[in-house]
Amino acid sequence: MPIIESSIQRERLNKAERAVRAPQISAYRTAVKNFEKAAAAGADNLQELFSKTSAAIDKAETKNLIKKNKAARDKARLYKLLKAATSK
């Protein structure tokens, strides 16, 4: 339990920021997992799912939830999955 007033304020602000960011990170991760599951199952709408997942990744990057390089890496991996699934 912090005693210094600035520490108390930072703790309160951190809690509020976590409450905002947690659902956003969860939405990003869910979009990626849904695409990976669909690619493994051989779904028909992979191109549409890829565009939605790519948008979710870009949104997470814009809000500084993930770094720029991680966003690029994730999109490259998902694109590789898309190409592998559609070439079959």
UniProtKB/Swiss-Prot annotation:
Gene3D superfamilies: Ribosomal protein S20 (1.20.58.110). Coiled coil: none annotated. InterPro entries: Ribosomal_bS20, Ribosomal_bS20_sf. GO terms for molecular function: rRNA binding; structural constituent of ribosome. One of its GO terms (cellular component) is ribosome. Transmembrane segments: none annotated. It holds the Pfam family Ribosomal_S20p. GO terms for biological process: translation. Keywords: Ribonucleoprotein, Ribosomal protein, RNA-binding, rRNA-binding. Belongs to the bacterial ribosomal protein bS20 family. Binds directly to 16S ribosomal RNA. This is Small ribosomal subunit protein bS20. The gene is rpsT.
